[in-house]
């Protein structure tokens, strides 16, 4: 489609459609790049944390080794150990007497996991919304363009194939633009959603390991 012609024609609706498409595409690719970098760093850091946790018998020593690692598993391990220490320091409190260590750790670890995962959820709603709405916005632009093309053709009195095919063909590209924006957004959403699920599985496994080791902890 001749976008220059669209902008020169001054039709505010078509201009708005293509500007919106451009913004949605920009947001999509920015989110894809930022989220991919974040997931890559998280996976790399988690691999280091797993290695230290596996090779170190003492949980206290393992947590100290991974403290400097910027990774979700490192944060979970630190917060779980801190929760254990807080419980032991306040065993005489009413909360400690009413809530066994086992249940207390489950609650605290689950809360930590939820807070960590919130950091990896940003942008997913935007990608899903763009993937779902972009084709319809493009279709709206096409319908609008065809409508005005037919009006202009009727007013000019030129009903030849060439006169009809040109303006309508240009209007149809708005739908293609919508698909061009939507397809990367949908693919990115699925890819990032898969990465987030893998991260959640790693957190679940680490949470179970921390829970068992803390229950068998002899000292804090």
Swiss-Prot record:
Listed under GO biological process in this entry are:
protein import
What InterPro entries would the database entry show?
ExbB/TolQ_transport (IPR050790), MotA_ExbB_proton_chnl (IPR002898)
Location(s), subcellular: Cell inner membrane
Explain the purpose of this protein.
Involved in the TonB-dependent energy-dependent transport of various receptor-bound substrates. Protects ExbD from proteolytic degradation and functionally stabilizes TonB.
Superkingdom of this entry's organism? Bacteria
- Tell me the PANTHER family matching this sequence: BIOPOLYMER TRANSPORT PROTEIN EXBB (PTHR30625:SF14), PROTEIN TOLQ (PTHR30625)
List, alphabetically, the GO terms of the cellular component aspect.
plasma membrane
Q: Give one Pfam family.
A: MotA_ExbB
Name of the protein described by the UniProt record: Biopolymer transport protein ExbB
């Amino acid at each position: 489609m001749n976008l220059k012609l669209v902008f020169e024609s001054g039709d505010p609706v078509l201009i708005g459609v293509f500007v919106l498409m451009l913004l949605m595409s920009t947001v999509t690719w920015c989110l894809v790049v930022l989220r991919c970098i974040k997931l890559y760093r998280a996976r790399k850091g988690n691999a280091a944390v797993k290695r230290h946790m596996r090779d170190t018998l003492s949980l206290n020593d393992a947590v100290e080794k991974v403290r400097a690692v910027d990774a979700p598993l490192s944060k979970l391990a630190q917060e779980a150990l801190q929760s254990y220490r807080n419980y032991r320091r306040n065993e005489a409190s009413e909360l400690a007497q009413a809530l066994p260590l086992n249940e207390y750790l489950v609650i605290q670890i689950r809360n930590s996991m939820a807070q960590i995962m919130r950091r990896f959820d940003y942008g997913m709603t935007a990608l899903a919304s763009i993937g779902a709405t972009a084709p319809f916005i493009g279709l709206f632009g096409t319908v609008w363009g065809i409508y005005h093309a037919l009006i202009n053709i009727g007013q000019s009195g030129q009903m030849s194939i060439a006169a009809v095919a040109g303006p309508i063909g240009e209007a149809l590209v708005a739908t293609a633009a919508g698909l061009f924006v939507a397809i990367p957004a949908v693919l990115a959403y699925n890819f990032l959603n898969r990465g987030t699920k893998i991260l959640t599985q790693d957190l679940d496994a680490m949470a179970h390991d921390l829970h068992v080791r803390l229950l068998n902890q002899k000292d804090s």
